[in-house]
Swiss-Prot record:
InterPro entries registered for this protein in UniProt: EFTU-type (IPR029459), P-loop_NTPase (IPR027417), Small_GTP-bd (IPR005225), T_Tr_GTP-bd_dom (IPR000795), TF_aIF-2_arc (IPR004544), TIF_IF2 (IPR015760), TIF_IF2_dom3 (IPR023115), TIF_IF2_dom3_sf (IPR036925)
Region (G5): 206-208
Region (G3) residue spans: 84-87
Family: Belongs to the TRAFAC class translation factor GTPase superfamily. Classic translation factor GTPase family. IF-2 subfamily.
Underlying gene: infB
Identification of the protein by name: Probable translation initiation factor IF-2
Length: 589
């Protein structure tokens, strides 16, 4: 495990380490998180919209109770604070002073499926933020030879399994270890590790059967206390928090769900936040925390200390940006406003030409932009917020039609934007899974390139080569009708043809592909063509190779904006043919 830092220095007071859960879709993130939350939430009220703040504390008394058979009596941390929203997008959105809000992470991997696309995205993000993490190898109950055992401890469970099951489990763990090694990560099963600073712990679990959660809590708590004491040392300073969600309550006003990761916050405090119009200051009208007594249970308080999930009712109606910082202002307004501005900067490389990207928060904007850039997709503009009519209007005027695309990640397309789309050629790609959005964006770009290329091909003669098939001679004159193989490019009705010596070889009158008459035909294909103004065995012959005739203007256009390699190679063949009569043909363009 790569830690942020390590220290043996004794610390007088520690705050709760903050934990985020990541992993591929359907690998069990939410189920595992619910199971962990179940160790701290006494009861859950069915139905209705949850009124809980999206962060759950598992206090030290519960951790000690869950892990009492695992020798964890020396723990000094007050508990673990789990971010309730799983996924690498949530992780990316939760920042703290330029780094990740989470002190630790759980990467959930389906032990039977192994590492998948979103697993890779999660690993990339964890490495980027240098966040220590453990692996929950989930769904061990689906491994062959599984025997159900009445225990929630993996260490007890594994001792009661058949050897065939143990072998199957080890094979799957070794497979994950080998794959992780390709990413430069050393890993092993948690109970086989001697140095946790160098090796990532893999904890086999079954979220469905409630196996392995005590070991998850034990490893997380132990790692935090042993290697992250400096990071989780409590400091009595003005409060620093990260906003998870912005809510507009009709009766109350605007509330901010946030994770307070350092210092304190009180009712009446002035707080600085980032809005769509830049940094702003507002006041705390009320503070709420979870009570731990159910999904709908909130408790109003006057003051909160880190680390804790909080709900803040603010005094002003301002457009606060989710994922942005929230800092308590004492006598340091200028410094805090500068800090808000710095932490809210978007770190995305932009290009003179490219697509537009919109996302719900700064972190997700950076996450989707990073993946798009990795695939060579250039970005001209990246902003937080829903897709608006102004976005449609701006993108519709981009000079390159291929870039007239707006990618929306976890955002809505406003009604006025949908109306504007009907009269524009702008494409919108939206979704909530990064790798799927990237795939869809690439498909849209490829389709746009194809359509643009087809439009160009239809507007001018395309350098093409065809070969007459001697076994398919249907008529010798008026017009010649023969079967041909289109070897490169695209032939069209009306194209003039030349021979290999540059002499005129007729004009294409019609094209038939099987029993269908077509206006054009792309290579490779075999079709029948009718050729006007020539006679077979006089101007053209069976086995002849013919070319579509082009002008010097076509050479100029293709050198400015090339087509496929086969077409460009055929262009060079035609230039060589033309230069037999005119050595300077195609040079004055």
């Amino acid at each position: 495990m790569a830690t942020k830092s390590s220290t043996s220095q004794a610390v007088s007071k520690l705050r709760q380490p903050i934990v985020c859960v990541l992993g591929h879709v359907d690998h069990g993130k939410t189920t595992l998180l619910d199971l962990i939350r179940g160790t701290s939430v006494a009861s859950k009220e069915p139905g209705g919209i949850t009124q809980r703040i999206a962060a759950t504390t598992v206090d030290i008394s519960r951790i000690l109770k869950e892990t009492e058979k695992l020798n964890t009596k020396g723990l000094k941390i007050p508990g673990l604070l789990f971010i309730d929203t799983p996924g690498h997008v949530a992780f990316s959105n939760m920042r703290a002073r330029g780094g990740a809000l989470a002190d630790l992470a759980i990467l959930v991997i389906d032990i039977n499926e192994g590492i998948m696309p979103q697993t890779v995205e999660s690993i990339d993000i964890l490495k980027k933020f240098k966040t220590p993490f453990i692996i929950a190898a989930n769904k061990i109950d689906l491994i062959p030879f599984f025997t159900d055992v009445k225990t929630n401890l993996f260490t007890e469970f594994i001792r009661k399994q058949r050897q065939e099951y143990v072998n199957e489990l080890d094979n799957r763990i070794y497979s994950i270890m080998n794959k992780l090694y390709e990413f430069g990560l050393n890993s092993d099963r948690f109970d086989r590790i001697s140095d946790f600073t160098k090796t990532i712990a893999i904890v086999p679990v079954s979220a469905k059967k409630n196996i392995g959660v005590p070991e998850i809590l034990m490893v997380l708590a132990g790692l935090a206390q042993r290697f992250l004491e400096r990071e989780i040392e409590y400091r009595d300073i003005n409060g620093h928090a990260t906003i998870i969600e912005v809510r507009k309550e009709e009766s109350a006003g605007i509330t901010l769900d946030a994770v307070l990761y350092q210092g304190t916050i009180s009712v009446g405090d002035s707080i600085a936040v980032n809005t769509k119009n830049g940094p702003a200051v507002t006041k705390v009208k009320a503070l709420f925390v979870n009570t731990g007594k159910g999904q709908r249970a909130l408790k109003e308080v006057k003051k909160v200390s880190a680390a804790e999930g909080i709900r803040v009712l603010i005094s002003d109606k301002i457009d606060v940006i989710s994922g942005s910082p929230m800092i308590v202002v004492r006598d340091n307004l200028d410094q805090v406003m500068k800090e808000i501005e710095e932490e809210s900067k978007v770190d995305i490389p932009l290009s003179e030409e490219g697509i537009y990207v919109k996302a719900e928060a700064i972190g997700s904007l950076e996450a989707i932009s990073y993946e798009l850039n990795k695939q060579g997709i250039k970005i001209k503009q990246a902003q937080v917020g829903d897709i608006t009519k102004r976005d449609i209007m701006d993108v519709s005027t981009l000079p390159d039609p291929i870039n007239r695309i707006i990618v929306g990640f976890n955002v809505s397309v406003l009604p006025e934007a949908r109306d504007a789309m009907s009269s524009s050629d702008v494409s919108i790609v939206t979704g909530d899974i990064i790798y799927k959005i990237v795939e869809d964006t690439q498909k849209v770009m490829d389709e746009r390139k194809k359509m643009l290329l087809q439009g160009r091909k239809m507007s001018m003669p395309v350098p093409s080569r065809i070969r007459i098939l001697p076994q398919y001679i249907f008529r010798a004159s008026k017009p010649v009708i023969v079967g041909v193989r289109v070897e490169t490019g695209q032939i069209k009705v009306g194209d003039n043809l030349i021979r290999g010596d540059g002499k005129y070889a007729g004009t294409i009158k019609s094209i038939r592909n099987e029993d269908v008459s077509v206006r054009y035909q792309d290579a490779p294909a075999e079709v029948a063509v009718a050729i006007d103004n020539v006679t077979l065995n006089r101007q053209i012959f069976p086995d002849d190779v013919l070319y579509v005739d082009i002008t010097e203007n076509v050479v100029k256009e293709l050198r400015r904006a090339p087509m496929e390699k086969e077409i460009m190679d055929t262009l060079e063949e035609i230039i060589r043919i033309k230069r037999k009569d005119n050595p300077f043909w195609g040079t004055r363009v």
